[in-house]
């Protein structure tokens, strides 16, 4: 992990195509802009964590009897 200290107006460049700029600092809040290609997904940490939790919950293994019942339903049609 890299920890950096930046002042308002200063930038951090990540790779060749991502630039993070410190816009302002007020109290304990920092306002950033992130310039990145559209294909780079950018999430706030709490949103990313919520998405990961939803994906993990959705990936619960299925009971094989459910799949068998689905196959039988398709055959009866």
Curated annotation (Swiss-Prot):
Pfam families per the UniProt record, alphabetical: CsrA
Any GO BP: regulation of bacterial-type flagellum assembly
InterPro entries hit by this protein: CsrA (IPR003751), CsrA_sf (IPR036107)
The name this protein goes by in its record: Translational regulator CsrA
Major localization listed first in the record, in broad terms: cytoplasm
Function: A translational regulator that binds mRNA to regulate translation initiation and/or mRNA stability. Usually binds in the 5'-UTR at or near the Shine-Dalgarno sequence preventing ribosome-binding, thus repressing translation. Its main target seems to be the major flagellin gene, while its function is anatagonized by FliW.
A molecular-function term among this protein's GO annotations: mRNA 5'-UTR binding
HAMAP family: CsrA
The keyword RNA-binding is assigned to this record: yes
Subunit comment: Homodimer; the beta-strands of each monomer intercalate to form a hydrophobic core, while the alpha-helices form wings that extend away from the core.
Keywords: Bacterial flagellum biogenesis, Cytoplasm, Repressor, RNA-binding, Translation regulation
GO CC, alphabetical: cytosol
Superkingdom: Bacteria
Family: Belongs to the CsrA/RsmA family.
Cellular location(s): Cytoplasm
């Amino acid at each position: 992990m890299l920890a950096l200290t930046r002042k308002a107006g200063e930038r951090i460049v990540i790779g060749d195509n991502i630039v993070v700029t410190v816009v302002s600092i007020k109290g304990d809040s920092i306002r950033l802009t992130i310039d990145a290609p559209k294909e780079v997904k950018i999430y706030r940490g709490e949103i990313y964590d919520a998405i990961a939790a939803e994906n993990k919950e959705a990936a619960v293994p299925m009971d094989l009897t459910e799949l068998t019942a689905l196959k039988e339903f398709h055959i009866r049609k």
